[in-house]
Amino acid sequence: MAVISMKQLLEAGVHFGHQTRRWNPKMAKYIFTERNGIHVIDLQQTVKYADQAYDFMRDAAANDAVILFVGTKKQAADAVKEEAERSGQYFINHRWLGGTLTNWSTIQKRVARLKEIKRMEEDGTFEVLPKKEVALLNKQRARLEKFLGGIEDMPRIPDVMYVVDPHKEQIAVKEAKKLGIPVVAMVDTNTDPDDIDVIIPANDDAIRAVKLITAKMADAVIEGRQGEDSVESVEAELAATETQADSIEEIVEVVEGSNE
């Protein structure tokens, strides 16, 4: 049985490609037809390739692969973060910083700085610093978290990279290829598929389409890590964690409010 049904794909609008004038001819074999100047993706192929991508992600996770989810455009940012976290993996959902993979040692220094600022707040250092300095540190932390928060705890360069819209994320894909990291990606009709190892022909501009495919890739990771029956239990566990996190945030707000 397919991991994603034709009905699910249709409802999420996965079949809508780009305008015909914006197509990449290398995607021709994944296109079913053209309607009103828009290419329509062949969903029978999407079903098949989604199955292959699922198996690839599941098997990688079963071998303890570190997987990086990448999607920096607004339609992808939330899904990439949520599904990476749900599957216990890592993400970049804001601008890709050049050298994130190929200049890993420098990126690690920035991550170390982020952790240092967090420690300063936790150990009370902030309380003895001038307010102006604390404000600058908070600003620096916010920026570092925005770009690097999703890989703060990533133990090493990823073994696999999942990408939403490799046309937009060309720098990320090039870095992965340079390092021999396989790329799994949602590939729309305007994209060159040659640099993608595992292709999922799909509309990468619709929020529902991105969420559907990305969630299935996260399910594959969860299954690979913990077995086929574990997806629901992991979701329940994460829901409990989120509730706990919310209560902690409330406590922080109360403490901050009392210091004003």
UniProtKB/Swiss-Prot annotation:
SUPFAM superfamilies: Ribosomal protein S2 (SSF52313). One of its GO terms (cellular component) is cytosolic small ribosomal subunit. GO terms for molecular function: structural constituent of ribosome. GO terms for biological process: translation. Keywords: Ribonucleoprotein, Ribosomal protein. The keyword Cell membrane does not apply. It holds the Pfam family Ribosomal_S2. Belongs to the universal ribosomal protein uS2 family. PANTHER family: 30S RIBOSOMAL PROTEIN S2 PROKARYOTIC AND ORGANELLAR, SMALL RIBOSOMAL SUBUNIT PROTEIN US2M. This is Small ribosomal subunit protein uS2. The lineage of its organism: Bacteria, Bacillati, Bacillota, Bacilli, Lactobacillales.
